[in-house]
Amino acid sequence: MGLTPMMRQYLEVKESCKDCILFFRLGDFYEMFFEDAKVASKELELVLTGRDCGLEERAPMCGIPYHAANTYIGRLVSAGYKIAICEQLEDPSASKGIVKRGIIKIITPGTYTDSSFLEENKNNYIMSFYLDDNMCAMSFADISTGEFNSTHSNFKEAVVLDEISKFAPREIVLEENIKESFIHTIKERFPNISISKIKQENFDYNIDNNLKEQFNNFNENEYETIVKKSANGLLYYIFHTQKNILSNINKIDYYSIVDYLTIDVNSRRNLEITENLREKTKKGSLLWALDKTNTAMGGRQLRRWIEQPLINKNPIENRLNAVEELLNNISLQEDLKEDLKSIYDIERIVGKVASKSVNAKELISLKCSIGKVPYIKEYLSNFKSDLFLNMEQCIDTLEDIHKLLDKALLDNPSLSVKEGNIIKEGFNEEVDSLREAKSNGKKWIASLEQKEKEETGIKSLKVSYNKVFGYFIEITKANLNLVPEGRYIRKQTLSNAERYITPELKEMEEKILGAEEKLIDIEYKLFTEIRDFIEENIDRMQKTARIISDIDCLCSLATVALENNYIKPNINAKDEILIEEGRHPVVEKVIPKGEFISNDSLIDTKENQLILITGPNMAGKSTYMRQVALITIMAQIGSFVPAKKANISICDKIFTRIGASDDLAAGKSTFMVEMWEVSNILKNATSKSLVLLDEVGRGTSTYDGLSIAWSVIEYICNNKNLRCKTLFATHYHELTKLEDNIEGVKNYSVSVSELENEIVFLRKIIKGGADQSYGIEVAKLAGLPSPVINRAKEILQHIEGDKEENSLNIAPSKEYKSKDYIEVSKDTSNTKNNLGSEIKHDTLSETNTDTIIEDESTKEHLSSNKKQINCRINDEKSIKKEVAVDSFQINFEYIKRDKIIEEIKNIDILNMTPMEGFNKLYDIINKTKDID
């Protein structure tokens, strides 16, 4: 048995989109078959059925109503799938044989433009990447807004990952032969990004002509070939999926990576620039703290400003001056914001115009939006700052477009453009004439109903309409005896009524329906003409939309500054960051007002180059370091900052090594990840960079960690090509000695108050190093059991009391009732264990600090040998094992007992079956066997 004609057609279409789920239009449904059906039924929770297809087995099948497709498509695209839409290309009733079908669009994560899928304040970027030898180029487009950005640089994975982190594309288009290891790196860092591959020829084909045709600002001599290839490949993919040249993508914007503040992937995450660390949502991020925008366009623009802070003084100061002027004119600012609230998403509306998917209601939204532009232009004329003056000169009021839309479209048109009820009365004579005919016909129908009621005496008689039978007279069965003989022609019999027609009624029906059909056709034709006119003027509307979004951003920054008592920072060229009473812009918003403790900061490239911060955990070191970085970023986007005074030098890069890393989930150790991040910082930072380092060396032994931290400080301060502004938090108090030996190191600490054996974190950064870590007190605050706290204090007293001796013997805790004992030897000579064999200990060489500091090359780093401390654990019968550890081991059997006791206390015996009770008892008995 052969395949059915319909199934042959399906398989032919499917062959052209193997990587997509094919939505195959059959009547009023999109059907999916074979593997596509299995995937869709699982993802969309649809019933999987079957269909005879000419094979021995029925083809797996599931389907969705075509009018509800967007909901299902959105779910599949969100899960990373691509959808190919195969439509009927001819009227089934007029076709002979099988209906002609074809793919009209391929929907992918980076090209989906349905408003229910998109976040209004966030771009939906698709990215292309092209690699050629040691150079790479990247292009980013948002087809819903028309943005298209390109850049290139020397190829470094870190650079590419930084740009991906900045733009957060939903999809990346790559050349099909690119190394899988690079794709793996991307997927490891950004698991939610969809990867698509195209052939090399799609990047190369007809480059200059394609770019000239698409971009009205393209000059082939201004762009490197690799940039043009990247842009060409992305344009090919967009056209391949959309089956259309999108007129809203009409300008290519080239940017240089070095023209903006570089914030690498880890730093964006650690500083919580646009999303918080825990939930990966906007709340709790810098963007959340600064976003008071009133338009979707402004929300997206503010995100871009925060993702790409400026590094040139003039544009930064232009923004700052504009924000200052808004703060000095509160009344004008409020008027501006009030009009901004009435502006819809112009960029995405004209994007729908370009894709021919806009409806009349959206054009009314466009009309209302551009109707506010003349008022905004008038407000701008009252300002004096350069940025506002330039905006006032450049903004297009679009009055001709507003006039057309106001004259042509009804204020409340139909949602569908193919159902009529779109064009306003007086715009077109033929529309008015047909509407009158339609209206008169319906009046005639109403008068007919009244006349028939009166002449027959049937009060319940009514004239109705449906699409199957047209107009008809309906009389209930109870009144059929009142129907005059021969007055009506029977049309349909129902269970409780009869339906009739008359020749006059059918004649009027033809007039009414003919008028309605013609009216719908004419209204749709007029609508497409209006849409085409708007499409011809997309560039004008996009320019105005960008100005509105900039105004919205500036108003947002002014509002936040006013509400939170921010001040205007001074931008200097002295390589100095001076902040008086600085505050963390996010933390102060999530704690009661006025409770945040402000702190001063002074960092430069000379005497205060590396600020060494000591103090206990939870005291506020990380918050302090982050606030310095965030204040710097805020200043460089043109925002006022949370401080009493701020003198900020422009930074080219910000690096952080703070907190845990996502790479831990990929199987990399804490220490390895930390060292990789530190290595990246030391290789890429410059004298213009700001570096935040928190607890460098914590992931290994004390001596190794101290040595590495010491060496990193030396490298930063003594390397003449580096000397970056650095905040360095540490628990290694030995490092505080470096202030006396290395130029630029300054000791600071977090003040702590001790009251009746309790500590209070004052959150104040003061000069001088901390004299102790308060680790046990922090552990107590964290809720460690009191036996652990008491034992820790006991051990600490032994260590501190005997630290000058060569060996340290710590007696076992009586509370633990353990027969083990621990001997920690610090003797540098050979000793003998209980079996008489020699145990050798490496010696920790005494380091001459002065010698290290005087070494100008900084290539000789702190060298020390790790001291192996052998712990011998003995019991009464024999030596069980011998281990070499970095500290001492403690028997924690009591913790196991506590857990078992707690488990027994929590047993709900009344709600357990006898068998459940028996199993629980058996489980507890097994657990107690592990306890001596």
UniProtKB/Swiss-Prot annotation:
A GO term for molecular function: ATP binding
An example Gene Ontology biological process: mismatch repair
Keyword DNA repair: yes
Binding site for ATP: 615-622
Gene3D superfamilies assigned to the protein according to its UniProt record, in alphabetical order: 1.10.1420.10, DNA repair protein MutS, domain I, MutS, connector domain, P-loop containing nucleotide triphosphate hydrolases
Function noted in UniProt: This protein is involved in the repair of mismatches in DNA. It is possible that it carries out the mismatch recognition step. This protein has a weak ATPase activity.
Name used for this protein in its record: DNA mismatch repair protein MutS
